[in-house]
């Protein structure tokens, strides 16, 4: 696997562990939804599927959104640094595997027809490439010559400025603006163009400062929690470290960016974030109890309630008692 893909995966996995408040807004921005943070419950769902040869098919991110009526919508996001002609086939595999996995929880089907629901899917490409279209398409032809065209929408991240990312409230993607410098840095590095590398190094430092300050403003405006703010600053540091050690070799930039982010990060932020998390935990407990009782009143078994709510059967019994 390419080193930039590995680093991007690491950073994105970290950023996608931000609070549910932030992740709901992120999904709204990516999929043009309009979920209210206070009216839905978001969970990160399984992203690993066992294949027939016992190998593991692993996707990037899967989410489930449950509204106040307990209707569920599923979402799937894949991240790509470069164009890949096999991506659409993998998206079909991921979607089918997730649909098959969720089939077990559906009870409303006729004896002779089963229904598999694909999640809403999107591929986010981070580096510019003129060959990347707005949609990925796969034609599937059955033996009777019936055809279907399976499509997945694409988000071209390089087309978004930091202001546009912020306006769409895709806050965890803000630090990834730094990754947009990678391609130019690689060109300058390969050409051994020291002047261009120095210029891009200065650009990276300035951009890191700008993104960190934007994150601080979001925290002050209560758009993100303290834990989210902390993770965004750490992602900025991590990306600067990656760019520097692979392309820039600037002996000062890592320390300068780390110092800058520390001056923005109030030690009380973490404490406030934990306190708010406890308050949210109480509210989540109340909502869980309501959900368990409603499912029980609808005739769901303890086993099914356990699977739907993602809690143990013992916990279900404890709530119902």
Where on the chain are the PLM-derived regions?
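Conserved single-residue anchors adjacent to enzymatic active/cofactor-binding motifs
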Residues: 1-250
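Intrinsic-disorder/low-complexity detector
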Residues: 248-321
């Amino acid at each position: 696997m390419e080193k930039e893909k590995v680093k991007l995966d690491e950073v994105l996995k970290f950023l996608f562990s931000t609070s549910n408040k932030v992740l709901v807004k992120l999904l709204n921005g990516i999929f043009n939804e309009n979920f209210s943070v206070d009216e839905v419950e978001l969970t990160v769902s399984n992203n690993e599927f066992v294949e027939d040869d016992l190998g593991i098919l692993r996707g990037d991110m899967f989410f489930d959104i449950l509204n106040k009526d307990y209707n569920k919508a599923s979402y799937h996001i894949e991240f790509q640094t470069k164009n890949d002609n096999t991506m659409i086939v993998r998206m079909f595999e991921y979607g089918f595997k997730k649909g098959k996995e969720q089939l077990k929880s559906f009870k409303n089907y006729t004896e002779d027809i089963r229904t598999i629901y694909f999640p809403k899917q999107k591929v986010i490409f981070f580096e510019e490439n003129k060959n990347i279209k707005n949609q990925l398409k796969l034609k599937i032809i059955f033996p009777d010559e019936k055809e279907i065209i399976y499509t997945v929408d694409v988000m071209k991240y390089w087309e978004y400025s930091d202001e546009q990312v912020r306006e769409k409230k895709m806050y965890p993607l803000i630090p990834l603006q730094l990754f947009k410098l990678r391609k130019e840095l690689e060109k300058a590095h390969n050409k051994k163009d020291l002047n261009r590398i120095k210029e891009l190094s200065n650009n990276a430092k300035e951009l890191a400062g700008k993104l960190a300050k934007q994150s601080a403003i979001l925290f002050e405006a209560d758009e993100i929690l303290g834990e989210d703010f902390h993770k965004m600053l750490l992602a900025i540091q991590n990306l600067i470290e990656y760019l520097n050690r692979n392309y820039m070799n600037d002996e000062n930039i890592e320390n300068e960016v780390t110092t800058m982010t520390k001056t923005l990060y109030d030690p009380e932020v973490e404490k406030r974030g934990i306190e708010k998390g406890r308050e949210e935990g109480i509210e989540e407990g109340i909502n869980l109890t309501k959900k368990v009782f409603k499912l029980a009143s609808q005739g769901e078994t303890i086993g099914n309630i356990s699977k739907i709510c993602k809690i143990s059967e013992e916990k279900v019994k404890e709530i119902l008692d």
